[in-house]
């Protein structure tokens, strides 16, 4: 599944007003987080709307890990606004909140977002969304997934719904240039995790393999430059993360994401950081169920001489390349907040996560406990 239309490259946001007019939209519900508004990123889009006299209302009650209340408040605000479409500006938090709001508005029988967990049984398409990513990582602009945090129960839940695909994606690297180094690094590693998990998931097949390998190659070449805020790095990451999204949205992910969701819910660990920590650990665990795929991962990441390596060597080379990239962009390999007494809850939550069944190697609660322990 893909967007009806997508625009890529510097200046792509100029197309937003053209699309709004072409669809005869009357008023935009602009979802964006407070920091993007504060630092003028959201204003790059609303300024275009102002120039053309297009009506909009801004909703900014969005946390980094969006909550049930963020969605509930957003639904009420949308109803009061008189808007007929959504412009989602931001990273995964803004995108996921927008998808949940749009789905509930179109399918009011699912007023409680928790009822949408798993493969959602909605019948109507989401309110039209124009998605404008400001991070290069989540690829939420081209996926059918969204993740919401249940603060009370200390868990994240994944909703999968073909009806929530944004109709238009506007991937403009200039909207990502203000990302600080840490956020660039973590969202970039999230994108790499999407590509590698999508490539190795049980549902992977030839067409998605093509997307994922190309994404691994582009991300591996671009992330260090993006962290240094080079034009080439930003452009590469904008494209690479989108291609990864084209792949994994159709085949799912694995336990690196299941475990990252749990760490985010319990410790509020940034999602990309949690993915970066878990990815090499999970790759080691999965290695014996991946055939020759790690050879291709290593090759895509620029490792030389992979054709001369035996299976153990190229599998190690792939994991080492991931660890080196994560280290180079400044992401820690250990989680100081992790406590031994939390391990049972963490493992049970990860085991129940919607991403877990796609992992190439089945993982028991005991297996997940030991994998979490490697972060200590």
Predicted features and spans:
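Glycine-rich phosphate/pyrophosphate-binding beta-alpha loops
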Residues: 137, 242-275, 353-358
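Carboxylate- and glycine-rich phosphate/diphosphate-binding segment that chelates Mg2+/Mn2+
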Residues: 145-251, 366
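Short glycine/serine/threonine-rich phosphate/pyrophosphate-binding segments
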Residues: 13-16, 38-41, 68-71, 94-98, ...
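Glycine/threonine-rich beta-strand-loop-alpha-helix active-site module
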Residues: 69-174
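C-terminal charged capping/lid subdomain of soluble metabolic enzymes
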Residues: 294, 298, 304-376
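Catalytic phosphate/nucleotide-handling subdomain of diverse soluble enzymes
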Residues: 262-301, 376
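ATP/NTP phosphate-donor binding region
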Residues: 1-85, 335
């Amino acid at each position: 599944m893909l967007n009806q239309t997508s625009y890529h490259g510097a200046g792509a946001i100029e197309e937003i007003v053209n699309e709004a007019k072409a669809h005869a939209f009357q008023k935009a519900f602009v979802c964006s987080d407070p920091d993007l508004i504060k630092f003028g990123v959201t204003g790059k889009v609303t300024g275009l709307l102002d120039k053309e006299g297009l009506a909009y209302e801004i909703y900014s009650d969005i946390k980094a890990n969006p909550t049930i209340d963020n969605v509930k408040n957003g639904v009420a605000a949308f109803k009061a606004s008189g808007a007929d479409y959504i412009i989602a500006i931001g990273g995964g938090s803004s995108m996921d909140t927008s998808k949940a709001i749009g789905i509930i508005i179109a399918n009011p029988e699912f007023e409680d977002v928790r009822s949408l967990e798993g493969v959602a049984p909605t019948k109507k398409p989401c309110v039209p969304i124009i998605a404008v990513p400001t991070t290069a990582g989540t690829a939420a602009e081209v996926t059918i997934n969204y993740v919401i945090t249940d603060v009370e129960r200390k868990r994240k839940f994944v909703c999968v719904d073909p009806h929530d695909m944004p109709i238009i994606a506007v991937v403009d690297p200039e909207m990502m240039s203000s990302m600080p180094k840490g956020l660039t690094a973590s969202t970039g590693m999230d994108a790499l995790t999407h590509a590698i998990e999508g490539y190795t998931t049980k549902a992977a097949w030839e067409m998605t393999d093509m997307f994922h390998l190309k994404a691994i190659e582009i991300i591996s070449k671009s992330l260090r430059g993006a962290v240094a805020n080079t034009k080439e790095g930003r452009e590469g990451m904008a494209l690479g993360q989108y291609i990864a999204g084209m792949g994994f949205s159709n085949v799912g992910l694995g336990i690196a994401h299941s475990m990252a969701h749990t760490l985010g819910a319990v410790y509020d660990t940034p999602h990309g950081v949690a993915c970066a920590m878990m990815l090499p650990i999970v790759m080691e665990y999965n290695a014996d169920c991946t055939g020759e795929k790690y050879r291709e991962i290593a090759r895509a990441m620029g490792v030389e001489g992979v054709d001369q390596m035996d299976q153990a060597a190229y599998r190690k080379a792939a994991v080492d390349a991931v660890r080196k990239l994560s280290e180079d962009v400044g992401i820690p390999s250990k989680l100081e907040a992790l406590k031994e007494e939390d391990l049972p809850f963490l493992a049970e939550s990860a085991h129940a996560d919607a991403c877990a069944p796609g992992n190439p190697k089945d993982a028991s609660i005991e297996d997940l406990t030991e994998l979490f322990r490697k972060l200590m």
